Structures are given as structure tokens and as C-alpha cells.
């Protein structure tokens, strides 16, 4: 393993950091989240056209840059530093990989070039608040209970025959960027008990009838959530086979999402720490900078070690996505603790609405609610590794920790 960044990765980091330093400061973030879409459309188009950000990990044959998950993780670390409100995670992490993996050639050709060019945003909608379970990050996704079915509610799909395809009925309560996405990938339950399965469907909100989208008040305004109601809504099956359950395909996508979220959290934690260090260097008390006090130094040193450890885990996961869940747990924990200490070390001003410290704290809390929490992420990995006994009657496995081509070596 060569842990050094390539020249291309360094250039992605440098270019994004310079641009976001100019265009995504705390005041810019506050302005962007209060728009109808919840992000700066002009900046998003610039990131797409000049840097190819949404298509960074998409194949060149579909208009993408042709890089991999590692390059996208480097970019996400920088967007995390700036707390950039954008549809990047929803579009490039949740939706695009599923379209690329499961879509027909016609669907990939029609959708992926538009996503790569920034002309189309997309997101994944799953019933209730079960996104982390559906992605295989927490709980047990294999049974598909999160998708509903029968009396379990969720979102139901029924074929209508002919050219009309499918109709969906149900509700998704927490859809990331669901109020503004131009395309929804909806996970729905189909079939009765003998043929019960979970399928993915394409819903185009601008043209489909029977869809109601409402932006919800969210803890973190940079992570806008929406409630999606589907009332006999027209939908197109993603892929060509309506007999194959997609649950197994969601787990690889979940590992990629975990890697990118971990990178974002590390970037946010590092930024919060840097801002706090700069503040304690200039804030004076008792005739000297508060950063010169030993108690403050020790707290900042502990935070630095925590952030660096989380960064190391995130970088490893970008190379070995199977470690994504553990990296995400460590990164979210690091961000939560660092953001809380940032508020405390800023003193009274850190508790004011005008200061940016609370933006980092809200990002930490909201991401844990949506994709965690931390203890469930770790518990899920432990269960899968068989630390509490063989999972589902299977022999213990170290696959949750293994690197590509490492013959299931455990990364310690």
C-alpha cells in the first residue's frame, strides 16, 4: 500500500480548498441554506463544470472524470472543511453508484452524463428513518423489513402493465435533499409473501403525478431533509429484472457512503479545531492568551490526536471501503467531541447564534442521527465480524476489516 497522495489528488484538494475559501465561508453557508434549494446553485454549477465534482468517480464513458472513491473522498474532506451545503452526498454517493450498478444501459446513458455535468441532482428515498439500515451500516438489512410490506407500511410498489410500468404508494420521512432533487431513487416493497422483495424505482418529481415533497425543519440546515409522499405515483423500475431483490446491492453503496461521510466529518473536525486554535491564540484573559494555559493546551492536544486518528482511519477506508463503517464511527465521534470543545473553548461567544461554532456541532449531531449513531455503527461491525458469536449461524469473518486483496487480513 502506498499511502502517499497522488499529484492528481493533491490538485483536487488544493483547487477545492482555494475555491471554497472564497465562496463558502460561514456567511455564505448561512445564505445558501436559506434558499429554496438549500444550496448555492451557481457554486454547484461551477464545481460541476470546472472541477467535474459530481462525476469525479463516474466512468468516462458516461461523462465522468473516471477517478475513484479515493479522489471523491479527498474532495469530500474539503467540502466538509467548508461545511458546504450541496447535493454532493445525495447525488454522487447515494444515487449515482446505484444507477451505475443496477441501471440498464439506456438508464445509465440517459442519467449519468447529466449527473456528471451537474444538470441533474438525485437522491435515495427509503421508508421511515431507515437509511442507515438500508445501506447496511446499522441493524440487519438482509430481511428487508425496513422497506415495509404487508402491515409493516413503508412504500408499496405494484405493476400496472403496459408502458405505464409501476405505481408507488407510501411515504419516506427523511430524504436527504429530497425537496430539490431532480430524480428520486425510491426503495419500495413489491410482491406478496411468496415473492416479497425490495426494488428500486426512478421517480421524476417534475413530471410524475401524485407526489408531494415538503422540506422539513432539520437540526443541521446544511443537510436538508424532506418528507416524500407517494400517492399512486408513476415510477420506472431501475434495471430490467423485477424479480431480484436489491438489498444485496445496497450494502456496497453503503460502504462508499460511509467512506465519503467519514472524509467530510474529518474535514469538518479539522476546520473546527483550526478555528479554535486561532481563537485561543488571540483571546486574552488575566493579561495573557488563553492558549498559553496548560489546561487549554492539553485539551487542544487531545483533540488534535483524536482528529488525526480519525483522518488516518478515513484515508485507510478510502483505500479499503470495507472499513468504511468503522472509519465513519471514529470520524463522527471525533467531530462531535471536537465541535463541543470548540463551543466551550470559545467561551460565551461560542454559544451565540452569530458564531460559526454551532454549525459544526449541528453537523456532528445531525449526521449521527441520520447515519449512526456511533455505537450502532460499531455494534453492527462487531456483529458482522462475529465478535459476539457467529452472525446468522455463519463462521466469524474479518471481512469488515480487510483490505482489498489482503486475504481477509485484519487491519489493526
State where each predicted segment sits.
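A short core secondary-structure module
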Residues: 125, 165, 171-211
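FAD-binding glycine-rich core of flavoenzymes that anchor FAD
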Residues: 102-122
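N-terminal glycine-rich flavin-associated loop
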Residues: 86-106
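Structural signature of FAD isoalloxazine-binding scaffolds in flavoprotein oxidoreductases
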Residues: 66-75, 148-153, 203
Amino acid at each position: 500500500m502506498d499511502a502517499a497522495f497522488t499529484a492528481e489528488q493533491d490538485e483536487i484538494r488544493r483547487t477545492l480548498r482555494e475555491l471554497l475559501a472564497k465562496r463558502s465561508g460561514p456567511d455564505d453557508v448561512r445564505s445558501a441554506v436559506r434558499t429554496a434549494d438549500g444550496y448555492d446553485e451557481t457554486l454547484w454549477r461551477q464545481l460541476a463544470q470546472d472541477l467535474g465534482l459530481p462525476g469525479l468517480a463516474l466512468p468516462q464513458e458516461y461523462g465522468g472524470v473516471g477517478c475513484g472513491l479515493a479522489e471523491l473522498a479527498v474532495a469530500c474532506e474539503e467540502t466538509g472543511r467548508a461545511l458546504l451545503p450541496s447535493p454532493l452526498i445525495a447525488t454522487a454517493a447515494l444515487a449515482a453508484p446505484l444507477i451505475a450498478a443496477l441501471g440498464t444501459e439506456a438508464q445509465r446513458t440517459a442519467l449519468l452524463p447529466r449527473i456528471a455535468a451537474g444538470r441533474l441532482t438525485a437522491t435515495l428515498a427509503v421508508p421511515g428513518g431507515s437509511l442507515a439500515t438500508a445501506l447496511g451500516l446499522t441493524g440487519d438489512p438482509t430481511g428487508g423489513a425496513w422497506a415495509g410490506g404487508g402491515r409493516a407500511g413503508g412504500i408499496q410498489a405494484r405493476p400496472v402493465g403496459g408502458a405505464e410500468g409501476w405505481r408507488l404508494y407510501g411515504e419516506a420521512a427523511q430524504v436527504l435533499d429530497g425537496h430539490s432533487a431532480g430524480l428520486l431513487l425510491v426503495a419500495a416493497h413489491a410482491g406478496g409473501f411468496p415473492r416479497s422483495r425490495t426494488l428500486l424505482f426512478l421517480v421524476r418529481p417534475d413530471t410524475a403525478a401524485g407526489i408531494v415533497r415538503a422540506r422539513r425543519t432539520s437540526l443541521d440546515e446544511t443537510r436538508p431533509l424532506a418528507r416524500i409522499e407517494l400517492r399512486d405515483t408513476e415510477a420506472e423500475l431501475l434495471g430490467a429484472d423485477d424479480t431480484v431483490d436489491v438489498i444485496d446491492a445496497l450494502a456496497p453503496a453503503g460502504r462508499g457512503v460511509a467512506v465519503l461521510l467519514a472524509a467530510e466529518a474529518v474535514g469538518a473536525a479539522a476546520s473546527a479545531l483550526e478555528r479554535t486554535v486561532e481563537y485561543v491564540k488571540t483571546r486574552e484573559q488575566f493579561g495573557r492568551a488563553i492558549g498559553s494555559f496548560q489546561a487549554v493546551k492539553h485539551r487542544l492536544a487531545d483533540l488534535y490526536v483524536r482528529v488525526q486518528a480519525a483522518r488516518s482511519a478515513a484515508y485507510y477506508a478510502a483505500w479499503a471501503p470495507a472499513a468504511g463503517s468503522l472509519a465513519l464511527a471514529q470520524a463522527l465521534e471525533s467531530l462531535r467531541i471536537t465541535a463541543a470543545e470548540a463551543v466551550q473553548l470559545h467561551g460565551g461567544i461560542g454559544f451565540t447564534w452569530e458564531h460559526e461554532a454551532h454549525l459544526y456541532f449541528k453537523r456532528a449531531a445531525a449526521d449521527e442521527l441520520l447515519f449512526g449513531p456511533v455505537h450502532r455503527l460499531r455494534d453492527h461491525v462487531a456483529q458482522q465480524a462475529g465478535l459476539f458469536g457467529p452472525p446468522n449461524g455463519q463462521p466469524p469473518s474479518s471481512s469488515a476489516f480487510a483490505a482489498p486483496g489482503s486475504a481477509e487480513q485484519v487491519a489493526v
